[in-house]
Amino acid sequence: MAGPGAWKRLKSLLRKDDAPLFLNDTSAFDFLDEVSDEGLSRFNKLRVVVADDDSEAPERPVNGAHPALQADDDSLLDQELPLTNSQLSLKMDPCDNCSKRRELLKQRKVKTRLTIAAVLYLLFMIGELVGGYMANSLAIMTDALHMLTDLSAIILTLLALWLSSKSPTRRFTFGFHRLEVLSAMISVMLVYVLMGFLLYEAMQRTIHMNYEINGDVMLITAAVGVAVNVIMGFLLNQSGHHHSHAHSHSLPSNSPSMVSSGHSHGQDSLAVRAAFVHALGDLVQSVGVLIAAYIIRFKPEYKIADPICTYIFSLLVAFTTLRIIWDTVVIILEGVPSHLNVDYIKESLMKIEDVYSVEDLNIWSLTSGKATAIVHMQLIPGSSSKWEEVQSKAKHLLLNTFGMYKCTVQLQSYRQEATRTCANCQSSST
């Protein structure tokens, strides 16, 4: 029967028809028969790199150090490479440009406040002179005279701030920072001179009682004066800036270098504080004048209230100026600023590595907020190679942590005291 032969021929036909289907499914695996030797070698080399074969790995150095791994650009950007000591010192210590920029910003704020205050004083002083003349009120005229004194003091302070920004000269090597202190002293002395004049006039009115006052004009002028002096008080108040900022944030809150109240007056401007005391005295006097005007307006027979307010004003101004006088005296006598503790600073310097002792530490203020230090330290023997590092750490501690304006660090190796060879010393000891 031709059945088996026909079946074989049918199967062969089916294979030929299905061959392309099987070829498509297996073509991805049958590449070895068509790839040349050169292409195969290239593929094998690629496979070696991807598989990180040991034959292509870099050789280990003879000294046993680990080979440096080749990293791509992204991994290098993500890495935090260790900095050298010189790089750390450059990163930690502020440069002169940064210090000058901060100082210019601080002076610009002070000048802005004082300029606005001077304009307000000038405008209201003219208004008080007119109102006092119309009301025949000695209290208002005296208040206008007080504002004239305050205006002259602020102008003097602005002049001092302008001169203090000038570069040092051969004669004044520290610059003109102390002019701000001088202007603060002069303004306080002007307040005391005015206080004496007010007390004298008040006593004359108390004794003679031969004056008449227009209560209506006095009341209106005094009310405007209170409003203006309240604005001046908010403008010149520095109570929100008494805390040490970036210079002392690393110190603990109970650090001995801080004032007991937690505030530091070292960052204030003495000129603005003096102007604030003037504004406070003006406010007290304006309130007193307002009370006196109210009494005189409705009870003219009690016009003695005018000199009584002058007495109270004099006592309050004397009390408020005592702190400025004390701070000014400390600066002139080159005392340590009240917000710094010499013993605590010495302890902090002694904690620096390789420091044997702190021989001398002198701290004073050029002006308010500009503390200066000179320190002489001895290092342990054999640490001469670390002098630059120790000096950098000491300067960083004084400038950044304790907020010094300038500092000088002197280093030397520790040496035991040698036997005295001076003839005078030996003769005196015998």
Curated annotation (Swiss-Prot):
Region (Zinc binding): 240-265
Location of the protein in the cell: Endosome membrane; Late endosome membrane; Lysosome membrane
Listed GO CC annotations: cytoplasm; endosome membrane; late endosome; late endosome membrane; lysosomal membrane; plasma membrane
A matching Pfam family: Cation_efflux
Ranges of the Lumenal topological domain: 135-143, 200-216, 297-311
Domain of life of the organism encoding this protein: Eukaryota
Transmembrane residue ranges: 114-134, 144-164, 179-199, 217-237, 276-296, 312-332
Cytoplasmic side, ranges: 1-113, 165-178, 238-275, 333-430
Binding-site residues for Zn(2+), renumbered to this chain: H146, D150, H278, D282
Modified residue annotations for Phosphoserine: S36
One GO term (biological process): zinc ion transmembrane transport
Region: Disordered, residue numbers: 245-265
Main location: membrane
Induction text: No change in response to zinc deprivation.
UniProt membrane topology term: Multi-pass membrane protein
Reported tissue expression: Widely expressed. Highly expressed in brain and testis. Also expressed in small intestine, medulla, lung, kidney, stomach and colon. Expressed at lower level in other tissues.
Known catalytic reactions: Zn(2+)(in) + 2 H(+)(out) = Zn(2+)(out) + 2 H(+)(in)
Oligomeric form and interacting partners: Homodimerization could regulate efficiency for zinc transport. Interacts with TMEM163.
Function (record text): Probable proton-coupled zinc ion antiporter mediating zinc import from cytoplasm potentially into the endocytic compartment. Controls zinc deposition in milk.
Descriptive protein name: Probable proton-coupled zinc antiporter SLC30A4
Natural source organism: Rattus norvegicus
Lineage: Eukaryota, Metazoa, Chordata, Craniata, Vertebrata
